[in-house]
Swiss-Prot record:
Keywords: Ribonucleoprotein, Ribosomal protein. This is Large ribosomal subunit protein bL17. It comes from Nostoc sp. (strain PCC 7120 / SAG 25.82 / UTEX 2576). Pfam families: Ribosomal_L17. Belongs to the bacterial ribosomal protein bL17 family. Signal peptide: none annotated. One of its GO terms (molecular function) is structural constituent of ribosome. InterPro entries: Ribosomal_bL17 (IPR000456), Ribosomal_bL17_CS (IPR047859), Ribosomal_bL17_sf (IPR036373). GO terms for cellular component: cytosolic large ribosomal subunit.
Length: 116
């Protein structure tokens, strides 16, 4: 039973799960769109929304928190520069998930997650 379990474990230990989410978040912000499994896309969506909300705040503390999460320092600086013009009047919902065909090897549900 998984009653009251809020964290999607993604079949990985906590440190590997955290590293996977950081990597997927970094690549989504860098490329604007990535293809991954549906469950991973749903988990990454909340992480990306948190990072973009931090960038909208724009304070030094928010920048340092983002630098601690995203792997690329230049990407953080670019995000903080562009976010106010791109998402200034939007209150959340910065990503879109599109369902695609299942993966050939194991028939896993695949999805494209992209920045709006």
């Amino acid at each position: 039973m998984r009653h009251r379990n809020r964290v999607k474990k993604l079949g990985k230990p906590a440190d590997q799960r955290r590293a996977l989410l950081r990597a997927l978040t970094t690549e989504l912000i860098r490329h604007g769109r990535i293809t991954t499994t549906l469950v991973r896309a749903k988990v990454v969506r909340s992480e990306v929304d948190k990072i973009i909300t931090l960038a909208k705040d724009g304070s030094l503390a928010a920048r340092r928190r983002a630098l601690g999460y995203i792997y690329d320092k230049q990407l953080v600086h670019a995000l903080f520069e562009q976010v106010s013009s791109r998402y200034g009047n939007r209150q959340g919902g910065y990503t879109r998930i599109l369902h695609t065909v299942p993966r050939r090897g194991d028939n896993a549900e695949m999805a494209i997650i992209e920045l709006v």
